[in-house]
Regions:
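Domain-scale recognition of functional cores that engage charged ligands
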Residues: 1-225
Length: 226
């Protein structure tokens, strides 16, 4: 309630970092909202569903089979890169040793990812190896190893803090989805558009708010048309 008015919708602009829950009041505030009838974007369950660990689990065929129609699975799996758990998993025995071996042999081919969003939290190359070799068991549980994506480069103008720069770039395309659920029943599940983030080719990290990339849009070109 705000005054005598019930809050219908809460949008979380923050709440994705441990730094957002430094004190008891912040944690109690989140608990209060979770137990209310307010629509949350996202609620705790949806936020957890977007974590890197869930992405890694969905790359396993036996897990993906539980959530997607079988005719779709080959096409979906063809878009995945390899992701590995850093701890022993009953679904994938020997996975952690395999992940460590892959990272140490070819660090330039992998990225270490925590359960975080917003950019600026990943580890690459030598820093990744240093991090892996000094992580506690609980820290290993909170990270996954992902094969690095090597997108095709293109030239673009980037505008950052009022300064423009024409440089070689790479872009990431993501889909916007809307999911509205109530007490376990899905009321709405729809694709509703896309997001393009473009950054300099020599930048490892992503994230618009973190200052690593810029918003962009797609431009459709017909082959053979001048």
């Amino acid at each position: 309630m705000i005054g005598n008015n019930p809050v219908a919708l809460v949008y979380y602009r923050a709440g994705y970092s441990p730094a957002d829950f430094k004190n008891t009041e912040a944690k109690k505030g989140r608990e209060l909202i979770e137990h209310s009838s307010t629509i949350q974007t996202p609620d705790l369950w949806m936020q957890l569903a977007g974590m890197k660990k869930i992405q890694q689990a969905l790359t396993l065929p036996e897990i993906l089979n539980q959530f997607a129609p079988k005719p779709w699975i080959p096409q979906m799996a063809s878009t995945f890169v390899k992701m590995h758990s850093l701890v022993e998993d009953t679904q994938a025995p020997g996975e952690s040793l395999k992940a460590m071996d892959l990272a140490n042999k070819n660090p330039e081919s992998w990225v270490l990812k925590p359960q975080r969003e917003g950019g600026g939290n990943n580890y690459f190359d030598k820093k990744m190896i240093q991090k892996l070799n000094n992580m506690t068991p609980s820290e290993l549980k909170a990270h996954v190893l992902m094969e690095r994506i090597r997108p095709r480069s293109h030239s673009a103008w980037l505008m950052v803090q009022g300064q423009s720069d024409y440089t070689s770039c790479v872009s990431e395309i993501g889909r916007y989805g809307v999911l509205l659920a109530n007490r376990g029943t899905i009321e709405l599940n729809s694709d509703c558009g896309y997001l393009v983030r473009t950054k300099s080719e020599d930048v490892n990290e992503g994230g618009v708010c973190a200052g690593y990339s810029c918003l962009n849009t797609l431009c459709l070109e017909e082959k053979g048309v001048p």
